[in-house]
Amino acid sequence: MWINKYACEFSIDENLVAATIMTESGGDVKAVSTKGARGVMQITPATAKRLCKKLQRPFSVAMLLQPQHNIFLGCYYLHNLLNTFDGCAVLALAAYNCGPNRVQSWLEKTPHLTTWEILETHASLETKHFVWSVLYRYGNRTR
């Protein structure tokens, strides 16, 4: 329900959102990572606080465990990342995992490389695995 609603609101493929959720948390609304990311879309409190400030919405760490709020923020964040990286899902997903500033620095260091070469050259094993896992699940959902 929330996936469809917010994917539509932010013009994102709902299958990409669902694949991100399954990769991040397996759909566990109470998931908390070792790095403190929370909820189905595994958003860190720092990222959520920044997004809420930008949206002029109230913020609390507890709201990250509420699917409606978590999916709203996750879709908003993914939408912004897709816009930042010109609709490139690979770079947007990498940024979702390791941060947009890091991905931007990869692009600045090696502008001559393809998207896949940039990912292979610069991304950590965790980020590579995340991107591949989301894309694999996305592919399975869209067949």
Model-derived regions: residue spans:
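Catalytic glycan-binding domains that act on GlcNAc-containing polysaccharides
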Residues: 1-143
